[in-house]
Every structure is written in structure tokens, then in C-alpha cells.
Regions:
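Non-catalytic alpha/beta scaffold blocks inside enzyme catalytic domains
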Residues: 1-15, 20-189
């Protein structure tokens, strides 16, 4: 409704006007920019577009699914039907952030395998079969975060991650290796 109102009143595409949505989680914009969406590759390129898909298949060295994935709401519906039996939750806490937390906790608890990668032992992590302790982006990791206004901010480590905590990219890289997939470099510049 707000988007429609902004369009109707001419407040889109003009300097100093428009909407800046408040997102529910940190770095949602940056995640979308990098392709962490069920229907988009990096740069918001459509998964269902054969030309886009072929370009990323060449870069990734793998055949990619030509169909859109499902978003969180549909994932919980699929859990309820028994169609989704495992989940890897990275930097989210759906056991506390979903609208119906009791229902979310029941569904997460019923999975055959729940893996959580997070900086805290969240309620979701408490339900997990496997927990990967991650480092904090703002103080312990090298990379970028993007605000809702699309301002990209560089982050550099100021301290070493505590205990067994590791950078997200290092955890994902090792998981790939253990599954026989070379995810390439772990350098954030790539």
C-alpha cells in the first residue's frame, strides 16, 4: 500500500523522495544483492531466465536448478506437510521471529535434521542437531554490509573470533569441500 501511495503521489525516482523499507533482519539488502533469495542470482537476476542461469552455471561450474526456490512462509508450510525435512538456518532465529512462534518451534523441532549457523545460541540453535558458531560481521569478519538505503559499508576484523567461532564464508567453504564441491576462494573480494 505504501509503495502504491508513493507511486500515485509521484514520490518514486525523485531525489530526496521514495521509500526506505525497514527490514526485519540485518543486511537483508546485502543478502538480496548477493543472491540470497529463492528466485534471484546476484544482482537480482532471475533464476528462471536461461541466459542468466547459464552465466552463473559457467561461473559456479555446476548445473543449477531452473525453478525458483521457496521463501520462508512456504518453507514452514512444506514442513507442516512433511515435504521439507531438513533445514540449514544461517543468521536467523525463526523460533523467536516468526509470527506464530509456537507453531514455528513445533515444525523446527520435527525436522529430521536442523543445522544452525549463528553468532549466538538462539532459541532456534537450541533446537538444532548441529550448530556452527559464527563470527560477528561488525567486529570479527572481513566483508561488507548493505543498509536499506543501499549504502555499502566495509567491515574489517577488529578482534579474533572467540572459541570455535569461524567466519561464515569459511564454514560454508569447508562444508562444500566435505560434500565434494569446490566453492572457490574464501576471500570476500571475490
Amino acid at each position: 500500500s505504501l509503495c502504491n501511495l508513493a507511486l500515485l503521489t509521484g514520490h518514486v525516482g525523485k531525489w530526496g523522495s521514495g521509500l526506505v523499507p525497514l527490514r526485519g533482519q540485518n543486511n537483508v539488502q546485502g543478502g538480496g544483492d548477493m543472491g540470497a533469495l529463492p528466485n534471484k542470482f546476484p544482482g537480482f537476476q532471475d533464476i528462471t531466465n536461461a541466459e542468466h542461469r547459464e552465466k552463473f552455471e559457467a561461473v559456479y561450474g555446476a548445473k543449477l536448478n531452473p525453478e525458483d526456490g521457496i521463501h520462508l512462509t512456504l518453507m514452514f508450510e512444506a514442513m507442516g506437510r512433511g515435504e521439507l525435512t531438513a533445514a540449514f538456518v544461517l543468521g536467523e532465529n525463526p523460533a523467536d521471529s516468526e509470527a506464530d512462534i509456537d507453531h514455528a518451534r513445533k515444525l523446527l523441532s520435527g525436522l529430521d535434521c536442523l543445522v544452525v549457523q549463528d553468532i549466538f545460541m538462539t532459541r532456534t540453535a537450541e533446537l538444532a542437531d548441529v550448530v556452527f558458531p559464527a563470527s560477528v560481521a561488525w567486529a570479527e569478519s572481513d566483508g561488507t554490509v548493505t543498509s536499506s538505503e543501499r549504502r555499502v559499508q566495509r567491515t574489517r576484523p577488529a578482534v579474533t573470533p572467540p572459541g570455535e567461532a569461524r567466519h561464515d564464508i569459511d564454514i560454508m567453504h569447508e562444508l562444500g569441500q566435505r560434500m565434494g564441491v569446490d566453492l572457490g576462494t574464501t576471500e570476500p573480494e571475490a
